[in-house]
Swiss-Prot record:
It comes from Herminiimonas arsenicoxydans. The lineage of its organism: Bacteria, Pseudomonadati, Pseudomonadota, Betaproteobacteria, Burkholderiales. This is Phosphoserine aminotransferase. One of its GO terms (cellular component) is cytoplasm. It is found in: Cytoplasm. Disulfide bonds: none annotated.
C-alpha cells in the first residue's frame, strides 16, 4: 500500500499503526459484529471506548482529578465562542478578557470574544508580522479580567510559546489545537485547555476541552445547552450524540502514544525533527525562515524560497517525491512543513534531502 509523507497542517497525518488498526477493526470491532461507526453511543461497547479514551488522555497529560475532560464538537473555532459564553459570567457584566495576539488564530479568538465581552489585547507581536511571542514582562493585563487567553502555537506563522505564562489568580485559557501532546506541560497552570483533534489527535470532528472544576457552572443565559460545559460534564460528554468515530481514533492514537513512551518521548522526537529541518534552513540562503530561534514552532515550519518563481516547481517536484501538502497558507505564501507527532523523523529527513537536491538543481 502506497503511503506518502503528509505535511498537511490539518487534517493532518495519523500514525500508520493507528490507520492499520482502524482498518482491521472497521467492520467488526473486537468481535462484536459492529463497526464503531454504527454503535449506539450509549451502548456497552462505545461506553468502554469513551472511558478508555478519557482515561488514557488523563494519564498521558497527568491531568489532575479536579479537571473534567470534555469530548465535544465544533472545533477550536466554535470554542472561540463557547469559552467566553462559559467564563465571562464569573465576573460582573460587561466583563473583560485579556488576549495575547500572536497571529491568525489569536485574531480569530479575539474577534469572536468581542461579541460577549470587552477585549483587552494585553500584548501583540503584530509589529513584527507575528514572528515572535511577546515577553511576559511586556503584557499589560487587566487585574480583574475574566481570563487571559493565549494560542500556544500559531500554525501559519510558525510561532510557539516556549513558556507557560504566570498570570496570577486570573484563569489562564489556552488554545492548544496544534501542539497538544507534543510537549510536556503542567496542566494545573491552566484553567482551560482546548484543542481541535485534527492535528495531533485524530480526524476532524472532535474537540478536546480540559476544564478545571471551578470553571463550570457560569454559562451565560444565551449559551446553548449543548455548549454549556457543566451540562456536558454532567452527561459525560453525551448531552448530545458525540463524534463517536473520531473519539475512537483519538483513543487509538493515545494508545499508540503510550506505546512510544508517552508525551516525554514524543517531545524528544519532536525536538529532533524540528532541529533537523531548522538546522538545514539556517545553513542555506536558498530558503529562509523569519522566526527567531526562541519562538520557532516545533510543529509548523514555514519557509520561503528566495526566488518565489520556483514555488510551483518546488511543490510539483516534492509531490513527485511523495512529499505532499507543503504549500504555505494563502495569507503568507511560501511553504510550510507541519511535522506533528505522527510525522516520523524519516519524513523530515526525506524533506531535507529533497530540499538539498532542489537547491542544487536550481540554486
Amino acid at each position: 500500500m502506497k503511503r506518502v509523507f503528509n505535511f498537511s497542517p490539518g487534517p493532518a497525518a495519523i500514525p500508520q499503526e493507528v490507520i492499520q488498526q482502524a482498518a482491521d477493526e472497521m467492520a467488526n470491532w473486537r468481535g462484536c459484529g459492529l463497526s464503531v461507526m454504527e454503535m449506539s453511543h450509549r451502548g456497552r461497547e462505545f461506553t468502554e471506548i469513551l472511558a478508555t479514551t478519557k482515561d488514557d488522555l488523563r494519564s498521558l497529560m497527568s491531568i489532575p482529578d479536579n479537571y473534567k475532560i470534555l469530548l465535544m464538537q465544533g472545533g477550536a473555532i466554535a470554542e472561540n465562542a463557547i469559552v467566553p459564553m462559559n467564563l465571562v459570567g464569573m465576573k460582573p457584566q460587561p466583563a473583560t478578557i485579556d488576549f495575547v495576539n500572536t497571529g491568525h488564530w489569536s485574531i480569530k479568538s479575539i474577534e469572536e470574544a468581542r461579541k460577549y465581552a470587552n477585549v483587552n489585547v494585553a500584548a501583540s507581536s503584530e509589529d513584527q508580522n507575528f514572528t515572535y511571542v511577546p515577553a511576559r514582562d511586556t503584557w499589560k493585563l487587566t487585574p480583574d479580567a475574566a481570563y487571559v487567553h493565549v494560542c500556544t502555537n500559531e500554525t501559519i506563522g510558525g510561532v510557539e510559546f516556549d513558556f507557560t505564562p504566570d498570570v496570577g489568580n486570573v484563569p489562564l485559557v489556552a488554545d492548544m489545537s496544534s501542539n497538544i501532546l507534543s510537549r510536556e506541560i503542567d496542566v494545573s497552570r491552566y484553567a482551560v485547555i482546548y484543542a481541535g483533534a485534527q492535528k495531533n489527535i485524530g480526524p476532524a470532528g472532535l474537540t478536546i476541552v480540559i476544564v478545571r472544576d471551578d470553571m463550570l457552572g457560569h454559562a451565560l443565559p444565551i449559551c446553548p445547552s449543548a455548549f454549556d460545559w457543566k451540562l456536558v460534564a454532567e452527561h459525560d460528554s453525551m448531552f448530545n450524540t458525540p463524534p463517536t468515530y473520531p473519539i475512537y481514533i483519538a483513543g487509538l492514537t493515545f494508545q499508540w502514544m503510550k506505546r512510544q513512551g508517552g508525551v516525554a518521548a514524543m517531545e524528544k522526537v519532536n525536538i529532533a525533527k524540528a532541529k533537523l529541518l531548522y538546522d538545514y534552513l539556517d545553513s542555506t540562503d536558498f530558503y529562509v525562515n523569519n522566526v527567531p530561534a526562541a519562538n520557532r514552532s516545533r510543529m509548523n515550519v514555514p519557509f520561503f524560497l528566495r526566488d518565489a518563481s520556483l514555488n510551483t516547481k518546488f511543490l510539483t517536484e516534492a509531490g513527485q517525491n511523495d512529499l505532499v501538502q507543503l504549500k504555505g497558507h494563502s495569507s503568507v505564501g511560501g511553504m510550510r512543513a507541519s511535522i506533528y507527532n505522527a510525522m516520523p523523523i524519516e519524513g523530515v529527513q526525506a524533506l531535507v534531502d529533497f530540499m538539498k537536491a532542489f537547491e542544487k538543481k536550481y540554486g
